[in-house]
Amino acid sequence: VRNPVLAIVFVAAVGYGFFNALGHGRSDKPMAIPAAAPGASQTAPRAMTENVVAYSTEDKAMQAAKNKGHSTLPRFHELMAAGTPGTYTVKFPLTQNGATEHIWMQLTGLGDGTFIGLLADEPVNGTKYKMGDRMTVAEADVEDWMVKNGGEVYGGYTVRQAFADMPKEQAAKYGITFKD
């Protein structure tokens, strides 16, 4: 039976290395998905750590956010071509040990239909990959993108959804202004 929950890491929105600084221990086993809160829907988002949220694969709002992220990749290319200042990242599914997480990669280059970069987060589902590993990701596999310059962010549709799902005061702590 396939696990109906996926992990969304939104560390790149709050700063690279922050997740690693929280003391996340690397393990060869996938992180356990916590049970839903009493009385909550079985598809409700579930906090796994301070900066990792588990979403059901059936969560329509998060799926819509991923679809928007992918469908707006032409805007990401426009911002790159215009030389918009900031850190450029893309989110993609990373599978290891039979579990998939959705993780950010900081771009260092472009290939023919691919993005090249460094993992911006510490993967939670195993030890095969680590933050800073060089990766090449097909554009077809990209689920979201961001250009982050200080507190201003273009894109980041899955992060927007994660913020919408948390208490407003918690989201406000991150000081992010989304632009389009």
Predicted features, each with a name:
Residues 2-104, 108-180:
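Mixed-charge, low-complexity intrinsically disordered regions
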